[in-house]
């Protein structure tokens, strides 16, 4: 369960008695109720969710271990060992907030506090857009040599377990070829991998 973010200072309703200690009595022009936000509110909501949720998560505004520790201690004081979640957010400017050694151990330090599920929201979005921008720029400036450089990086990464060089095999084409071969008793002429450029050029 995700509590309010530590910066969430608005509620749509003040009906819940558990919120009343944080409600300021002020309302916005849209009708929202203003609240005193922060880690105490996050802990309070987390404790309300804890009996029912597998994981408790409060969205934070900075990668701050002491802040994370305060939330963890607040939850564990009443629910020892309760598993916590932490968003290692791409909205944080990591290098501006932490040193390289701090970043290298950030994950492990969180784990010691009980943050068992750690994730980077939108990591794929940023990786995809950065990679495609770099590829488009290389292709613009160097033509197919720019793409070939990407391909050579793929080849080198195979030693570390990268498998998407052979994109047809990677997405399961071989499986569907096998199914088709069984269904047609070996007489299919439209399987994909046999005789393909992938089979001939990528070994």
Where do the PLM segments sit?
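Flexible C-terminal active-site loop/helix
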Residues: 143-194
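Short acidic/histidine-rich active-site segments
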Residues: 120-125
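Alpha/beta enzyme core
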Residues: 1-119, 132-133, 137, 176-203
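C-terminal helical cap(s) of enzyme catalytic domains, especially alpha/beta-barrels
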Residues: 129-145
């Amino acid at each position: 369960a995700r509590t309010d973010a530590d910066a969430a200072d608005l509620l749509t309703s003040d009906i819940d008695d558990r919120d009343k200690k944080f409600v300021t009595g002020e309302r916005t022009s849209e009708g929202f109720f203003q609240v005193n936000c922060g880690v105490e509110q996050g802990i309070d909501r987390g404790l309300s969710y804890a009996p029912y949720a597998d994981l408790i998560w409060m969205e934070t505004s900075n990668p701050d271990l002491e802040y994370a520790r305060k939330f963890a201690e607040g939850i564990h004081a009443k629910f020892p060992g309760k598993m916590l979640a932490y968003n290692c957010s791409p909205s944080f400017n990591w290098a501006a907030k932490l040193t390289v050694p701090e970043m290298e151990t950030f994950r492990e330090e969180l784990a010691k506090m009980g943050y068992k599920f750690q994730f980077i929201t939108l990591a794929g979005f940023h990786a995809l857009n950065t990679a495609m921008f770099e590829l488009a720029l290389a292709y613009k400036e160097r033509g197919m040599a720019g793409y070939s450089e990407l391909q050579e990086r793929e080849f080198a990464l195979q030693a570390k377990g990268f498998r998407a060089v052979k994109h047809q095999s990677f997405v399961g084409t071989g499986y569907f070829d096998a199914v088709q071969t069984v269904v047609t008793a070996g007489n299919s002429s439209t399987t994909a991998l046999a005789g393909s450029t992938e089979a001939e050029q990528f070994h």
